């Protein structure tokens, strides 16, 4: 099974229960954050480590985009990277792709864009 590197910002991660894949989750909202782009609503800390004690969760960079978490993973694990890594946002299934498409492609062994053209 492919390894999941997940960048989460105030996301519900219940969907991960269905996938036995090894993973790491970078919690971008571990210290709190903003609910929207205009910084009008402050979010409390996500407490993902308490919500999901079985998950492998670490603090993400609250100032960077999801790509900063992916690069952190690559740099920190450069000498021992998994054979295949899926770089995901915490809301991938609910926002970017339908679950049935995700299930069909998620353990591919070659580059596969995670997109669902019919979902938009």
Region locations from a protein language model:
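ER/Golgi luminal nucleotide-sugar-dependent glycosyltransferases, focusing on the catalytic module
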Residues: 1-120
């Amino acid at each position: 099974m492919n390894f999941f590197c997940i960048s989460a910002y105030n996301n519900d991660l219940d969907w991960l229960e269905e996938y036995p894949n090894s993973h790491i989750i970078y919690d971008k909202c571990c210290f709190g954050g903003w609910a929207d782009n205009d910084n009008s609503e402050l979010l409390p800390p996500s407490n993902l480590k308490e919500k999901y004690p079985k998950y492998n969760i670490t603090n993400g960079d609250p100032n960077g985009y999801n790509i900063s978490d992916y690069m952190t993973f690559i740099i920190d694990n450069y000498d021992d990277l998994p054979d295949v890594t899926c770089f995901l946002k915490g809301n991938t299934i609910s926002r970017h792709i339908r679950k049935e498409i995700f299930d069909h492609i998620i353990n591919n062994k070659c580059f596969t864009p995670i997109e669902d053209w019919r979902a938009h």
